[in-house]
């Protein structure tokens, strides 16, 4: 029997050949999809230890500059914890589904992110319809006519959001406040009891966080307002700026494609063409738990964060010239 002549998908795919099916791309990454429960616990415990140590330092240190520095680094660590929760929400943190839900909720607490609401907005909408205008709501581009139809305040905000200087403001207002923190029916038509419970959970954590900082300030004879600024507001705003920047650069690059036609969007292989791999010096990508190796994540969401670097390298080896770096 004569073998069928099919493209060799075990070798790099030239640009003049069709992109293989997503199933094939995922098969390349199967060796990198193994998840470790013990590693998940170590990552979560380590980052929480960093978070609590830095928040404590914002109260215990005397110099304002030192408080500010610790507050900003605490915000960065909130981002690291969020990436762990992000993995849990994708079921890529451990092999255990229910454990992932618990660990994800724990990891999301410092970012005040309700787990189930984020799961719906991110897993169902963003990953299900990445860069499909009218469905995916993250950094959706506007036509000139759509921009002109905005109110003066909305125009001002859009200019600020897209200036490159205020991605944190965008995330805080458009994503966290409108869609993740007791969203109204306009932004979240689906209503589930778990949405309310998860929102209440992060409120309780936030209240306890504020109360602990205020009590520590009183106990040490410091300004309560300064302590809250350095120990709560600065970390939270830094975190929003960090995640806002991450999403901004992932989905607004000039080479990233957006579509308003579902058929064209499907044909464009959106899991490859709608995001970028942003590289940094000094191992900053590793310090961010490799969330910037984003193409690999969109191709296969089951890849754990500690294997994304290898997965991204494999895709770039097999798909030369197709991945935006």
Where in the sequence are the language-model features?
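Polar-ligand-bearing catalytic/cofactor-coordination segments
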Residues: 2-5, 9-13, 28-30, 254-258, ...
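Short, motif-level signal for alpha-helix interfacial/capping segments enriched in acidic residues
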Residues: 24-26, 59-72, 129, 228-231, ...
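Membrane-embedded catalytic scaffold of the fatty acid hydroxylase/desaturase
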Residues: 78-85, 89-199, 255-325
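Short, charged cytosolic
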Residues: 2-25, 164-180
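Juxtamembrane/interface segments at transmembrane-helix termini
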Residues: 245-257
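Alpha-helical bilayer-embedded segments of polytopic membrane proteins, i.e.
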Residues: 34-81, 111-113, 158-173, 191-246
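Cytosolic juxtamembrane amphipathic/interface segments immediately preceding
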Residues: 26-35, 188-189
């Amino acid at each position: 029997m004569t073998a069928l002549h099919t493209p060799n998908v075990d070798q790099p795919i030239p640009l003049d050949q069709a992109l293989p099916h997503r199933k094939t791309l995922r098969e390349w990454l199967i060796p990198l999809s193994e998840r470790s429960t013990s590693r998940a616990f170590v990552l979560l415990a380590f980052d929480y230890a960093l978070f609590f140590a830095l928040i404590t330092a914002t109260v215990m240190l005397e110099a304002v500059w030192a408080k500010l520095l610790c507050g900003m680094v605490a915000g960065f660590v909130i981002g690291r914890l969020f990436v762990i929760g992000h993995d849990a929400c994708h079921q890529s943190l451990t092999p255990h589904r229910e454990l992932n839900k618990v660990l994800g909720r724990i990891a999301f607490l410092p970012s005040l992110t309700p787990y189930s609401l984020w799961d719906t907005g991110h897993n169902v909408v963003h990953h299900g319809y990445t860069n499909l205008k009218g469905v995916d709501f993250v950094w959706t581009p506007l036509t000139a006519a759509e921009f002109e139809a905005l109110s003066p305040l909305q125009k001002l905000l859009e200019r600020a959001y897209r200036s490159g200087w205020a991605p944190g403001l965008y995330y805080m207002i458009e994503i966290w406040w409108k869609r993740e923190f007791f969203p109204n029916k306009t932004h979240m038509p689906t209503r589930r009891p778990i949405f309310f419970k998860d929102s209440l959970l992060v409120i309780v954590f936030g209240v306890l966080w504020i109360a602990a900082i205020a009590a520590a300030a009183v106990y040490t004879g410091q300004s309560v307002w300064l302590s809250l600024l350095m120990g709560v507001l600065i970390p939270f705003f830094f975190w929003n700026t960090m995640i806002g920047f991450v999403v901004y650069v992932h989905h607004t690059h000039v080479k990233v494609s957006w579509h308003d036609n579902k058929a064209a969007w499907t044909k464009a292989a959106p899991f490859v063409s709608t995001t970028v791999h942003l590289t940094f010096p000094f191992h900053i990508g590793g310090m961010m738990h490799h969330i910037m190796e984003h193409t690999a994540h969109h191709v296969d969401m089951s890849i754990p964060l500690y294997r994304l670097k290898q997965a991204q390298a494999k895709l770039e080896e097999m798909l030369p010239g197709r991945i935006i770096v």
